[in-house]
Amino acid sequence: MTMSSLNAPALELRGISKSYGTVRAVKPLDLVVPQGATYGLLGPNGAGKTTTIRMVLRILTPDTGTILILGRPQSQEGLDRIGYLPEERGVYRRMKVRALLAFFAELKGVRRRDSRPRIDRWLERMELADRADSKLEELSKGNQQKVQFIGSILHEPEIMVLDEPFSGLDPINQRVLREIITELKAAGRTIIFSTHIIEHAERICDHVAIIARGSKVADGPIAAVKREHGEEYVAIRLEQWTADAVSVVRRLAGVARVREHGTELEVALRDGADPQRLLHELVATGVRLRRFEVTEPSLEQIFIERVGARDADVPAEELAHV
């Protein structure tokens, strides 16, 4: 029997804020994370993502606002239902892997006799079974990170909070972690993870919130966020890239913006532009196409337009906190 209610959100933030002196790291913020969601907290470095997570976990105290976990005010009982992988990796380097994981599990109320089979299962899954009796300092940084992830999940939490979880992992281990997140979601767990790498959110999440300079600029199911964005896009693949061909596309009357990816072009249309007319005009110019498809905006496009280049650079003194 858990403390969760079927009708309550996994996490609800009501007007929480946090300042460090004159720096407003998080302005009054409202968020609702449904149970069972894979929820991406997106934003550039220094946006306030980590500060928000630390307030959820009671590492920091909000200046204002209320936080509800599974429908109830923050409490140790609620926090024990959360697994947390911090952005700052931290392990006891001289401890052995199995001993460290048993210690982490015990901190969350899991007895050693119960944690042993869980530890063995996760070490096998993460291809670390042969390092169970190695000291952490003998492991690579990537393997240390995998150990820390195992430590965050041994108590089988209902909610997982992962702060930049893919940082430091090679592509193979990034794929393994994505598979695990997908399995956890299928099992009904709520996954909240922060990232500034939009591709990860696009692949994994069903809900997102985009934060810039401590304020929420978009929030909701990904499909709804894309619909609300409003603009229509066309994906074009040229038979062969040439500067002249790209220039022709840019000059067409219905085109607002073009982003290049080799022979692939992402074209944002002006209000009222007709994609069929655009295709007709493009063919008439003699530009040879391999693909022309009306598409929805990518999260990356929405992120760039909502956040803006101005927020991509945040002063170093702010980054130290947020």
Briefly describe each language-model feature range:
Residues 8-13, 18-213, 217-218:
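ABC transporter nucleotide-binding domains
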Residues 178-270:
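ABC transporter nucleotide-binding domain
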Residues 70, 100, 109, 227-230, ...:
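A generic structural signal for secondary-structure junctions
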Residues 73, 111, 129, 255-256, ...:
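Short coil/loop linkers at secondary-structure junctions
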Residues 72, 216, 239-241, 272-273, ...:
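Short, surface-exposed acidic/glycine-rich loop or hinge patches that mediate macromolecular interfaces
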Residues 2-5, 270-322:
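C-terminal coupling/interaction segments
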